[in-house]
Amino acid sequence: MANKSTRLVSRLKRQKRIRKRITGTGERPRLCVFRSSAHIYAQVIDDVTGSTLAAASTLDKEFIENKDKLVGKDAATAIGRLVGARALEKGISKVVFDRNGFLYHGRVKALSDGAREAGLNF
């Protein structure tokens, strides 16, 4: 269990270091990713107003209805495409990618690749 808590503490330290440098504005909001053991979440956030402009997760009805039990990297890529499409509907094409302390590998990388495929630039 000690290993698990040190992993969490290390991720939170990385998150603080990243968050000092990354902020989202109205013209270039922040694409924030959260990864749990079972699901992945993505939000496009304007930090100036503190509002979420677009969001998607593996718990969305639209994702569950259209996808046949996608898991892992495939689900993350689909969520990246979904959040990218929702951001483009709102007129957002440029974002700042916030990996939220998670390593840029696996599902986090797959989500960013899916968002780039949808047309987001970062």
UniProtKB/Swiss-Prot annotation:
InterPro entries named in the record: Ribosomal_uL18_bac-type, Ribosomal_uL18_bac/euk
Q: What is a single cellular component term in the Gene Ontology annotation?
A: cytosolic large ribosomal subunit
Listed under GO biological process in this entry are:
translation
Entry-linked CDD domains: Ribosomal_L18_L5e
List, in alphabetical order, the Gene Ontology terms for molecular function in this entry: 5S rRNA binding; structural constituent of ribosome
Q: List keywords of the entry alphabetically.
A: Ribonucleoprotein, Ribosomal protein, RNA-binding, rRNA-binding
Where does the source fall among the domains of life? Bacteria
Family the UniProt entry places it in: Belongs to the universal ribosomal protein uL18 family.
Query: Its quaternary structure?
Result: Part of the 50S ribosomal subunit; part of the 5S rRNA/L5/L18/L25 subcomplex. Contacts the 5S and 23S rRNAs.
Function recorded in the entry? This is one of the proteins that bind and probably mediate the attachment of the 5S RNA into the large ribosomal subunit, where it forms part of the central protuberance.
Protein name (database record): Large ribosomal subunit protein uL18
- Which source organism? Desulforapulum autotrophicum (strain ATCC 43914 / DSM 3382 / VKM B-1955 / HRM2) (Desulfobacterium autotrophicum)
Q: Which gene encodes it?
A: rplR
